[in-house]
Amino acid sequence: MTKETIRVVICGDEGVGKSSLIVSLTKAEFIPTIQDVLPPISIPRDFSSSPTYSPKNTVLIDTSDSDLIALDHELKSADVIWLVYCDHESYDHVSLFWLPHFRSLGLNIPVILCKNKCDSISNVNANAMVVSENSDDDIDTKVEDEEFIPILMEFKEIDTCIKTSAKTQFDLNQAFYLCQRAITHPISPLFDAMVGELKPLAVMALKRIFLLSDLNQDSYLDDNEILGLQKKCFNKSIDVNELNFIKDLLLDISKHDQEYINRKLYVPGKGITKDGFLVLNKIYAERGRHETTWAILRTFHYTDSLCINDKILHPRLVVPDTSSVELSPKGYRFLVDIFLKFDIDNDGGLNNQELHRLFKCTPGLPKLWTSTNFPFSTVVNNKGCITLQGWLAQWSMTTFLNYSTTTAYLVYFGFQEDARLALQVTKPRKMRRRSGKLYRSNINDRKVFNCFVIGKPCCGKSSLLEAFLGRSFSEEYSPTIKPRIAVNSLELKGGKQYYLILQELGEQEYAILENKDKLKECDVICLTYDSSDPESFSYLVSLLDKFTHLQDLPLVFVASKADLDKQQQRCQIQPDELADELFVNHPLHISSRWLSSLNELFIKITEAALDPGKNTPGLPEETAAKDVDYRQTALIFGSTVGFVALCSFTLMKLFKSSKFSK
């Protein structure tokens, strides 16, 4: 509930006691003589007996049926209507005029129907709506009145009905609370009174909450899990007697209610089933205790439309233009725990059934994953099941490419804190200058790097990606149409671990390479050619000529298929010559059959991302003294000028002082 102010418009025939209700409610006493129509009255939160359920302010709007224009104006700005009648004539007018009039205005707001002037009622009797407060401050509401039932059946916009008396103060606070509750805890999204069932969206939300609360994945909520859910949602323990009452109630329903006679709602020694959890919340809705259900739903960030709050799924994160987003230690820890929780057979991999259970409380696999052939975009075991290493690598890639997807799925998985705590933003990329050229500075705070693998078709790019994931070489050639991704972790000297993303661009290669914004996501470009194909290297030369801005990025030349006979390239310049001309390393000769050469390449790519200056074209080696951060140079120069100016000013003052003393 995000509304801070609720507007309650009080309607009804002349003489039913609308103004008296307002005065008696606010003054706590009955005043016989008052004006016909009261001005709007604002009631603060602390007036309510249940401040947790109340908005910041509730405005009561008194109306008169003699001025329909003013009445309609107020109705159109109302959040809830308090419709009052007091006798047979005004009761008939409710269904013959008032409710049809609301419909004619196109209003889609709840109506609280109130029978006023019930002065003879001193307590709730069998003919009135029973309203009582139990030990948990929940409201149990039941309509048992011959007047109310027919009108409730005909007009679904009526939220509930109540009898009041302005003269004796009977149920005034309760009526006011029901007006608030119709907005703060609406019944309509949860329960379909016409069929007597929870609505589909409510069922979906409650099923997801059950799955997240079933910590041991046994399909039952045992006493400890119920206690945990109770503390999480209501910040207090559940009474043993109340818990036993719930169990007995569910057992009784499953034995005697024909609808549930063959369905287990509670199993002694195991706990409440998913069906039992749904039935319990259905009972809350039927008895007017849907505040309980809403408390559960809102703890899990559901809005009034029963979707998870978008601000929770996609929190705003300030990311500078040259920064990237990675998982924090807390994020990695949570994802490790999720993996271990759903690895039921403890074989170190998530099979299809385990993945299905894991993603059951989400909308399904992320779109990024389905478009990149998950799980074969990362490390899988010999059964094709994603390993923990592959799981963490996949989420590292997802966070780097689209952190908003990660925050959403963290919430879906049940991450309890602000999803931003599971992420960390790297420092903005600094630029340095050497030989008049700007290039990227060294990196020391990142663990995830992105590499575009480009080259002529059939030069071995796909085999390179497969080898990166530890898969054996295949002789079968399959051209890459859509972009492909491979992500894995690797360890450099010193034991520091990094995640490397290799992207093969497919038919989108030209479009991506000419998109300078897309290239900002790229840390290294791996220029691959087939050393056994004399026509292969010319493709790279033409790319570098066409997209000259590629030379602003670190480049790594790779000569693939080195196990085959090396061919002279039919090109105006040979690979080694071009590398020398660009001041980058000579091509690294690799083969999918030589594992050591592949490992050397992946380490080389990562090192190029960490130290861009050694691999960016057009940067001849210079002494460290000449290769400095251009911002630092400006700072040092400015400091020097300032120091000289200060010394000059001091000397002038000393000179003038000396001259004056003479």
UniProtKB/Swiss-Prot annotation:
Sequence positions that bind Ca(2+) 1: D214, N216, D218, Y220, E225
Keyword Zinc: no
Consequence recorded when altering K18A: Loss of function
Group of enzyme by EC: hydrolase
Example GO BP: phospholipid homeostasis
Pfam (any one): EF_assoc_1
Residue sites binding GTP 2 per the record: 455-462, 491-495, 560-563
Record annotation: effect of changing K461A: Induces collapsed, globular or grape-like mitochondria
Phenotype when the gene is knocked out: Collapsed, globular, or grape-like mitochondria.
Record-annotated EF-hand domain positions: 201-236, 330-365
Mitochondrial intermembrane side, ranges: 656-662
Classification via SUPFAM superfamilies: EF-hand, P-loop containing nucleoside triphosphate hydrolases
EC number: 3.6.5.-
InterPro entries found in the cross-reference section: EF-hand-dom_pair, EF_hand_assoc_1, EF_hand_assoc_2, EF_hand_dom, Miro, MIRO_dom, P-loop_NTPase, Small_GTPase
Disulfide bridge partners, by residue number: none
Membrane-spanning segments: 635-655
Gene Ontology molecular-function annotations: calcium ion binding; GTP binding; GTPase activity
Name of this chain's protein: Mitochondrial Rho GTPase 1
This protein's encoding gene: GEM1
